[in-house]
Amino acid sequence: LITHKHADHTGELRAFPNAKIYASREECKADELQYPNVVPVDFTDGPYANFEKSQKIAEGVYFIEAKGHTTGNSIVIAEDGGLYYMIHGDVTYTDEALYANKLSVVFEDIGAARKTLDSVREFIGTHPTVYLSTHTPLGYENLEAKAAVDLNDPPESKPVGEILFGQASGKYVCSVCGYVYDPAEHNGVAFEDLPDDWKCPRCRQGRDKFNRA
């Protein structure tokens, strides 16, 4: 299920030649996704909760029209165990922006982006939602902890100016998917000593996409 056309979300679709790949019809046209295993979605199943258009993909899995970040942007909601897991792509780049009600820094339609974020926040306010961001480690932490968002209780964040860069942890974070490379989990091998062709285990990006934690 592809939320939007940007390369950091679609760049390795070729790795799944036998999978059905769902994307909104608008994104399929924009990204020229015209292959036998690509399924354009038209959101013909009517409203889902407070969202106006949706498509049921499987039992408990829904594709939701959520324009703004791109003109054909979508979100995925998976229902399980009384929780609603929201894979939102880049409706917000960080969880802090969700809590602060701030738009993504990238959008193709600012009016649609505002409407989508308002709808996302309204949904979260009435459904126990695990918010799965893709550009911050919080997405994976939320998933592992099955932590539902409480918009009235934002997580504590530390201003950049207060971070003690001198106390290096040896950890590096992938700027694309949020994967944390911890030498302690890799036989003590420092990130700097990894081979040049090393790839992120999660998104397969190169070392140049990593920043010091």
Name each model-derived stretch:
Residues 1-23:
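Active-site metal-binding motif and surrounding structural segment of the metallo-beta-lactamase
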Residues 15, 20-67, 71-143:
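Metallo-beta-lactamase
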Residues 140-161:
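Short, electropositive alpha-helical surface patch
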Residues 168-170, 196:
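Short metal-coordination and nucleic-acid-contact micro-motifs, chiefly zinc-binding Cys/His arrays
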Residues 174-177, 200-203:
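Short cysteine-rich clusters marking metal-coordination/redox-active sites
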Residues 183-184, 209-212:
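Short, non-ligating residues that shape and space the ligands of small metal-coordination modules
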Residues 186-198:
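Short linker/helix segments within small regulatory modules
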